[in-house]
Amino acid sequence: MKMNILVTLNSGYIQPLTVMLNSLLSSNSNRDFRVFVAHSSLTREDFRYLEEHVPMDRCELVNIQVPHTMFADAPVLERLPKETYYRLFAARLLPREVNRVLYLDPDLVVVHSIDQLYRLDFKGNLFAAASHQFG
């Protein structure tokens, strides 16, 4: 069974995403992944770059094109681009058959297995999250 991963990004995060995906595969050598790539501006060249720099035998990329109009009125800051909002609407963006997905920032490095995190008991909640503290 493939683990479902969600990433949200713009073209400025393609290279960091290749690092994240390679570290994910390296730290989870016994797993295959379906990676949902939610974006509104990636090009074919961006996806081609990913396919050339990430082993595709264990990593299926799924292109989730988000309409530009979906977040046209959302507040955008330098540290809060519109792509940040996509994860909040994962249930609307992902295929209905996806019943569990793990969101990972495209600029992190995975250093351990994510099995335990992926199988976390939500205790009846629709989602679980970790806090992010600055400073």
Segments predicted by a language model, with ranges:
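Glycosyltransferase catalytic domains, chiefly GT-A lineage
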Residues: 1-135
